[in-house]
Amino acid sequence: MAKRIKKTEEITKKFGDERKKALDDALKNIEKDFGKGAVMRLGERAEQKVQVMSSGSLALDIALGAGGYPKGRIVEIYGPESSGKTTVALHAVAQAQKDGGIAAFIDAEHALDPAYAAALGVNIDELLLSQPDSGEQGLEIAGKLIDSGAVDLVVVDSVAALVPRAEIDGDIGDSHVGLQARMMSQAMRKLSASINKTKTIAIFINQLREKVGIMFGNPETTPGGRALKFYSSVRLDVRGNTQIKGTGEQKDSNIGKETKIKVVKNKVAPPFKEAFVEIIYGEGISRTGELVKIASDLGIIQKAGAWYSYNGEKIGQGSENAKKFLADNPEIFDDIDHKVRVQYGLIEEDNTEEKQSSKEKETDEKADKNLVLELDDTIELED
């Protein structure tokens, strides 16, 4: 019986060695034909955690779960007209430039306002802009920029405005069934691998349409077919909510609107989270406003009555004064922002100072102990 078991083990080992050798040979051949890294074990990848770039909004970074837009992925931002889609995308452009990256904007709608973009923090002198004549041209330009590996962010505004060449050359009234959907499907197949390889973030802004004859369920849909929905790692639904009234001399005027951004699809974190941001007309997302609200909810900024305090010092009476204080003191703004991100687990806590202080404390304790021992020895000698 023992001999039979031993024989079986030998056969199994021999068979296993043969399979391993066959796999090694196959991997060598694949590497020879297609280059190093064509096939690898998942654990061998240097970067296992998804890299992200901040969206430019703290509330949206928290809703996204990972701390921002994932690099090397496709993002779709859609919603009704004038809901703030382009504003959200321009904040991402400003953040990419702030991080030292290069951003490109494919303006298929031919409606980008340079003055508004600059007000949101975009360096318009460094922004690459293209206003293509057709959908194919716009997607080809986006593809070449992505393939270069030198661009960190590409924004396409919008998918609905990417008109196929055949439709432009034809007459108004001609039927072009599924033409745009086929164009987008082909583009997604070509771009997705390049986007992932170059770690470029591709943001596609999209409009809303309504399906005809829908009696039950949601009649809303987005143009361009289903390909973009499938290839997107993140999809954001942007909707304007209530108007924001001004204060003081502007108390009778609407100075902005509260906007809800819902993460309807997320492949890198749990989906269906919502972010509520204040979009101020002419200024964009109020970063100080969202920080005051979130930090107050977490207790990082203390609120007593109408007064807001941080680290025991009052920073303003009323939210507007607190916002103004943070806008005038960027160092304190960054400090509070860092603490909020640490508390939500978006970034790792920097324990360098804590480790250093604990080390100094330990050194002091050792010095005190040595001093006590020396005093004891001195007393014994005197005795």
Curated annotation (Swiss-Prot):
ATP binds at residues 79-86. Gene3D superfamilies: P-loop containing nucleotide triphosphate hydrolases. Its main location: cytoplasm. Pfam families: RecA, RecA_C. Residues 353-369 have a biased composition (Basic and acidic residues). Residues 347-369 are annotated as: Disordered. It is found in: Cytoplasm. One of its GO terms (biological process) is DNA recombination. One of its GO terms (molecular function) is ATP hydrolysis activity. It comes from the Bacteria. Keywords: ATP-binding, Cytoplasm, DNA damage, DNA recombination, DNA repair, DNA-binding, Nucleotide-binding, SOS response. Can catalyze the hydrolysis of ATP in the presence of single-stranded DNA, the ATP-dependent uptake of single-stranded DNA by duplex DNA, and the ATP-dependent hybridization of homologous single-stranded DNAs. It interacts with LexA causing its activation and leading to its autocatalytic cleavage. Belongs to the RecA family. This is Protein RecA.
